Regions:
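RNA-contacting regions in translation and RNA-metabolism proteins
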Residues: 1-43, 51-76
Length: 76
């Protein structure tokens, strides 16, 4: 799932080599922390958060099929 999220985010930004996704577990949930270049964060978040919302929906759907819980956070 980390690879899928990395692929999606790298496809959206101008500097894909500066994208990093880290994974951590907390309370039975996997949390993915996404970091991108300062100028690319807006592309990942989208207008009024629309793009990041859709990324979260997609990741939750994939996780649900595998019986897992996930969340996606955009880090500063």
């Amino acid at each position: 799932m980390k690879e899928l999220l990395t692929y999606i985010v790298q496809s959206l930004v101008d500097n894909p080599d500066q994208v990093s996704v880290t994974e951590r577990k907390a309370d039975g949930e996997t949390i993915y922390e996404v970091r991108a270049a300062e100028g690319d964060k807006g592309k990942v978040i989208g207008r009024q958060g629309r793009i990041v919302k859709q990324i979260r929906i997609l990741m939750r759907a994939v996780a649900q099929r595998k019986g897992k819980k996930v969340s996606v956070e955009i880090m500063d």
